[in-house]
Amino acid sequence: MKNNLYVFFLFFITGLMSCSHHSGLYEHAEKIMSQHPDSVLTLLSTIQDVNDLSEKDRAMYYLLLTEAEDKTYKKHESDSLIAIATEYFDKTDDVKRKAKAWYYRGRVVDDLKDAPRAQDYYLKALQNEMEITDYAFLGRLYNSIGMLYTYQEVYEKAVLYQKKALYCFEALYDSIGQSYVLRDIGRNMTALNKMDSAIFYYEKALYFCDQKSKSSVYRELANLYLDIDNYSKGLEYIEKVLSSPLKKSMLDSFYFVLGKYYQKTNQVDSAYYYLGYSSNSSRLQTQAAAYYHLAQLERFRENWKGYANNQIRYE
């Protein structure tokens, strides 16, 4: 009932405005964007013909539309509309909207798996970095750049930007933002083989995680400790996962860690069972890791045919 009244209110205030004056509508949309992006989409849908808008209003429309779609997890298919916003705001002194336009253009092409263009657009969003005072926006921007570098396996640069994101989220006392960034820094430190640093960031992430997110960090810490042959600590975090709410989508990756623990502690039958289960995962990374450890089991048994078969599947 409350949501219906809210949408009615949006239509009401829209009706009070003439088609030639949209600034009030856009300002209201910006104010409610963080909490009600779905309502922003409803509000924007009341604008009849976007092509009749002024250049500025059209740029604002496409910026708000792209931002609201991004915040409601709608799949981006083209950057042609947000390009109208970047083209307009790049000619202005509106630092905040210029940065946002480039950021959301980067988000769109990031969705389209075009990493070089995404990187270019994200960095353009930072062209007036020192003048941007919106820490929530800066935190998201830095984090997006960090994630992009992570996917490209440029881990040192990823950590650099993720630490900047962390600073922003700390300034805002944003526990959710801090928990995700700390976890991601932990992952990149693991990739850099800086295990002590990885443990530090993972354990710090646990301080900010909600109960549902902790099981994922516990699992990653368990896997890390197994990699450095600290089986007692690995088991400690495995037990923490078992005592936490476990999402069905996490079963494959958790069973892989469990199988890896049994393989490393020579509990062969259990290792075969859990690694075999995780080798059927829909995630290629989990599949490959499971086949690698199944190959090691066969190598230990000197079953060279089984070793070769699993090694081929791993590679």
List each model region and its residues.
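Inter-repeat boundary and helix-capping residues of tandem alpha-helical solenoids
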Residues: E55-R58, K75, V95, A115, ...
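Residues that mark the junctions of alpha-helical repeat units in TPR/alpha-solenoid scaffolds
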Residues: H21, L53-M60, E77, K91, ...
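TPR/Sel1-like alpha-solenoid repeat signature
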Residues: Y62-A68, L81, K98-V109, Y121, ...
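Sec-dependent signal peptide recognition
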Residues: K2-L10
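C-terminal motif of bacterial Sec signal peptides marking the signal peptidase cleavage site
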Residues: G15-S18
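Hydrophobic positions within repeat-based interaction scaffolds
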Residues: S23-V50, E55, H76-D79, Q119, ...
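Amphipathic alpha-helical segments of tetratricopeptide repeats
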Residues: S45-V50, A83-D93, K124-T133, K163-D174, ...
